[in-house]
């Protein structure tokens, strides 16, 4: 069966501002008439994401609103109950979307109240069927929703009652990044993300056993005139910068090495830790890694960096070895680079580029704590 939408722009207009020429028709090939509406819905979603790429912050999330349009984004990976959350909690709140919360720079939201894709069981097996918000008796979509809070959902059958708490900002960033679409295409993407996450004092974590028990917690965040922004964590933005690479390469950090940062796309620092976005990969740096990265803004000797660590974090009987080890991890991860070393012969960069990397996915010694693909969902 060929399912064609000859006026995709009109279908998207309710959720995406009509600020450009009409999109070309969407055509979806499907051999199953039951699955065809889901396939069409998915195609429209992908086109909507493409239209806002590089402009809007897009969460893979449920959007539910209060009476004045104050909207909470409930973020979680696919297959973990977001549609169930929308169908249950949306009966008492406004339904904005169950797929993609599209957040503009002023935190207004382009509503996308698509039909809900609900998994059903029949003789064929698991299928996804489209159910309208009206059929599910969800609340009306507000005309001008705006983001007021971002909540990471985490189902835990051992939790006796729902627990809504503030997340450390760095934890929230790393939890939400995999559930964004085309984040690196935004200008200063991590700063844009942090501004959204910190609304109402967030980001928030909601741990629960059954989503129907969470209505009060979610509704409280949408209540009119709620202002928790004063509780938001303080964070520092370090905009990306292009750094020159020396013609020669040193791979091993020694006490005579001179180091500085490599090119990075964006970075934020909070509570002594940081997230550095480089080559579309976010790396979380602990206090030690962050202090070294911040200190290496300009070319610095290992001795200078060591002294900075002692001054900011404190002394340690093995501080020199710990700093050398941490610097090596940061160099291996290409977060820092050695630009000179008078006591080590360099390797030509083209020869170094041919050597296999041994760093991907490394977790080490209080320096680089985690790395993951920042654009795992949509490029």
Language-model regions, residue ranges each:
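A noncatalytic interaction/capping subdomain that flanks phosphate/NTP-handling catalytic cores
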Residues: 1-78, 91-92, 102-290, 294, ...
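Short helix-to-turn junction characteristic of helix-turn-helix DNA-binding domains
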Residues: 295-300
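Acidic/polar hotspots within intrinsically disordered regions
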Residues: 366, 373-375
């Amino acid at each position: 069966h060929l399912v064609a939408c000859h006026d995709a722009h009109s279908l998207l207009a309710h959720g995406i501002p009509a600020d450009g020429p009409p999109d070309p028709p969407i055509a979806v090939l499907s051999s199953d008439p039951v699955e065809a509406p889901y396939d069409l819905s998915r195609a429209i979603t992908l086109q909507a994401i493409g239209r806002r790429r590089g402009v809007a912050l897009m969460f893979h999330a449920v959007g539910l609103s209060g009476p004045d349009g104050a909207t909470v984004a409930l973020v979680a990976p696919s297959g973990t109950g977001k549609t169930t959350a929308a169908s249950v909690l949306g009966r008492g709140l406004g339904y904005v979307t169950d797929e993609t919360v599209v957040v503009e720079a002023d935190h207004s939201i382009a509503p996308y109240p698509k039909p809900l894709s609900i998994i059903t069981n029949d003789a064929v097996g698991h299928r996804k069927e489209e159910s309208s918000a009206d059929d599910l008796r969800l609340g009306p979509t507000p005309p001008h929703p705006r983001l007021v809070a971002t909540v990471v959902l985490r189902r835990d059958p051992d939790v006796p009652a729902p627990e809504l708490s503030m997340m450390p900002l760095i934890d929230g960033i790393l939890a939400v990044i995999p559930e964004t679409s085309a984040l690196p295409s935004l200008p200063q993407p991590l700063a844009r993300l942090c501004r959204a996450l910190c609304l109402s004092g967030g980001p928030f974590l909601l741990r629960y056993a059954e989503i129907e028990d969470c209505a009060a917690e979610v509704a409280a965040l949408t209540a009119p005139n709620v202002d928790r922004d004063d509780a938001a964590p303080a964070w520092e933005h370090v905009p990306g910068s292009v750094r020159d690479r020396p013609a020669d390469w040193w791979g091993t950090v020694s006490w005579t090495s001179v180091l500085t940062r490599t090119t990075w796309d964006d970075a934020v620092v909070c509570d002594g830790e940081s997230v550095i976005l480089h080559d579309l990969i976010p790396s979380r740096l602990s206090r030690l890694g962050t202090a070294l990265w911040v200190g290496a803004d300009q070319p610095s000797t290992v001795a200078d960096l060591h002294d900075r660590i002692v001054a900011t974090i404190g002394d340690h009987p093995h501080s020199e070895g710990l700093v050398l080890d941490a610097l090596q991890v940061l160099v291996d991860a290409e977060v820092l680079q050695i630009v000179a070393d008078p006591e080590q012969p360099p390797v030509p960069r083209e020869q170094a580029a041919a050597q296999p990397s041994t760093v991907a996915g490394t977790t080490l010694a209080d320096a680089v704590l985690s790395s993951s693909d920042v654009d795992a969902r949509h490029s």
